[in-house]
């Protein structure tokens, strides 16, 4: 094992995560229909600051992400600062790492803390699948640019006459990889076939996710980390994730048809995470700054790792690559973990990563490591359910996982937890957290 890389400031301070909060997550076109991601971000940051009772001017940086970006608000981070009453001098910039976006936001704030340029910051992300940047065809876009430069009405009419009816149709956001044309569901199908993951195994994992998430809500475990929101017309409160199917049965999952490979596939809408709206954020600061403000941290960021692999095959194996690196940098092994939380983009992807984490052959032949990362103990894995149940507002999921894991570690008396996610483009992320 290589030498551990401690995440501390020049003064030896650990990176503390003092608070975390999210909105409830809503299925597309339901509770947050018509509310853009920037407004969801404002909601959660405003409430996070109010609950923490930290002076707004104590926050020196805000790093926020949005995967499905809106042209009218390209820097969501700065809009959140300006729209929440924070000090206008607060540094703010936006990041995007697909489904691992808020992992990246947390890492960026942590790096600023370690560099000594700030002492406290906010990291998070928001996405809306209900408010989308509907575009125009390339032909229409080109004509519109040329029309803007045309000098006469005749020139403008000539340009418009070149268009066909199909050129006027709206163009929804792409769901396929730009470089390959493959949808993430196509890759999930490929991984299911490559690693021998059955439909029954996928449905069982999805069922487990919903049951555990429903139980977590029923036992009140999520109440402290999920805010109550009010959407127009501001009459009905929305305070719990609305995708969780606690009353479903395994037989219900078996009824759905494959969503990607219609003839021979096993990936369905039920064993995949749905399109979702929501936002999440965490407050990070140096350990000494937390003490100055009289705050007890939820926990600490022990290490993190980002990886990238080929996109043509096994694109969603990011956790199998990033997990051993994050553990190594933390000076830990799989056996040292109290909790292991993996983003469930698809049940097939999740099960493939779990399989390869315990594979000596994968470790040796692919990762170039002497031994497997380690089998994931089922009693430690996604103990409160995962993204299949909660939903997946792309940029918010990482912050949800971090906050949820730290709260659960505290309930268990402390220890180490690892959170990890795959992301589009063959990217992966993992973070080791510590709670006392």
UniProtKB/Swiss-Prot annotation:
InterPro entries: Ac-CoA_C-AcTrfase_FadI (IPR012806), Thiolase (IPR002155), Thiolase-like (IPR016039), Thiolase_acyl_enz_int_AS (IPR020615), Thiolase_AS (IPR020610), Thiolase_C (IPR020617), Thiolase_CS (IPR020613), Thiolase_N (IPR020616). PROSITE patterns: THIOLASE_1, THIOLASE_2, THIOLASE_3. Pathway: Lipid metabolism; fatty acid beta-oxidation. Its EC number is 2.3.1.16. SUPFAM superfamilies: Thiolase-like. Keywords: Acyltransferase, Cytoplasm, Fatty acid metabolism, Lipid degradation, Lipid metabolism, Transferase. PANTHER family: ACETYL-COA ACETYLTRANSFERASE, CYTOSOLIC, ACETYL-COA C-ACYLTRANSFERASE. Catalyzes the final step of fatty acid oxidation in which acetyl-CoA is released and the CoA ester of a fatty acid two carbons shorter is formed. Heterotetramer of two alpha chains (FadJ) and two beta chains (FadI). Belongs to the thiolase-like superfamily. Thiolase family. This is 3-ketoacyl-CoA thiolase.
């Amino acid at each position: 094992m290589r030498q551990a890389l401690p995440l501390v400031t020049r003064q030896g301070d650990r990176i503390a995560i003092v608070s975390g909060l999210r909105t409830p997550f809503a299925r597309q076109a339901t509770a947050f229909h018509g509310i853009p991601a920037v407004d969801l971000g404002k909601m959660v940051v405003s409430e996070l600051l109010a609950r923490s009772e930290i002076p707004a001017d104590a926050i020196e940086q805000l790093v926020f992400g949005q995967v499905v970006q809106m042209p009218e608000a390209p820097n969501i981070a700065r809009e959140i600062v300006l729209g929440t009453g924070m000090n206008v001098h607060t540094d703010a910039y936006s990041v995007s790492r697909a489904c691992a976006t808020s992992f990246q936001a947390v890492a960026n704030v942590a790096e600023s803390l370690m560099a000594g340029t700030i002492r406290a910051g906010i990291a998070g992300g928001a996405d809306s699948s209900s408010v989308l940047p509907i575009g125009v065809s390339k032909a229409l876009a080109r004509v519109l640019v040329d029309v803007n430069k045309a000098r006469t009405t005749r020139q403008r009419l000539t340009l418009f006459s070149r268009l066909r009816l199909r050129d006027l149709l709206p163009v929804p956001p792409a769901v396929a990889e730009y470089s390959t044309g493959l949808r993430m569901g196509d890759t999930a199908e490929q991984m299911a076939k490559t690693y021998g993951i059955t439909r029954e195994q996928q449905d069982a994992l999805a069922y487990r996710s919903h049951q555990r998430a429903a139980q977590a809500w029923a036992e009140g475990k999520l109440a402290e980390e999920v805010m109550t929101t009010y959407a127009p017309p501001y009459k009905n409160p929305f305070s719990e994730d609305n995708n969780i199917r606690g009353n479903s049965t395994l037989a219900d999952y078996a009824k759905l048809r494959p969503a990607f490979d219609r003839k021979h596939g096993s990936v369905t809408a039920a064993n995949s995470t749905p399109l979702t709206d929501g936002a999440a954020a965490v407050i990070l600061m140096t350990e000494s700054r937390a003490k100055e403000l009289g705050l007890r941290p939820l926990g600490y960021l022990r290490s993190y790792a980002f990886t990238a692999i080929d996109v043509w095959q096994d694109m969603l194996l990011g956790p199998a690559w990033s997990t051993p690196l994050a553990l190594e940098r933390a000076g830990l092994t799989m056996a040292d973990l109290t909790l292991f939380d993996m983003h469930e983009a698809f049940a097939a992807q999740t099960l493939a990563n779990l399989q390869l984490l315990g594979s000596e052959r994968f470790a040796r032949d692919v990762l170039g490591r002497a031994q497997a990362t380690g089998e994931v103990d089922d009693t430690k894995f996604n103990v409160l359910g995962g993204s299949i149940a909660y939903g997946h507002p792309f940029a918010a999921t990482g912050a949800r996982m971090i906050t949820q894991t730290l709260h659960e570690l505290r309930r268990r008396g402390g220890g180490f937890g690892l959170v990890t996610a795959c992301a589009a483009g063959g990217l992966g992320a993992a973070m080791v957290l510590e709670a006392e």
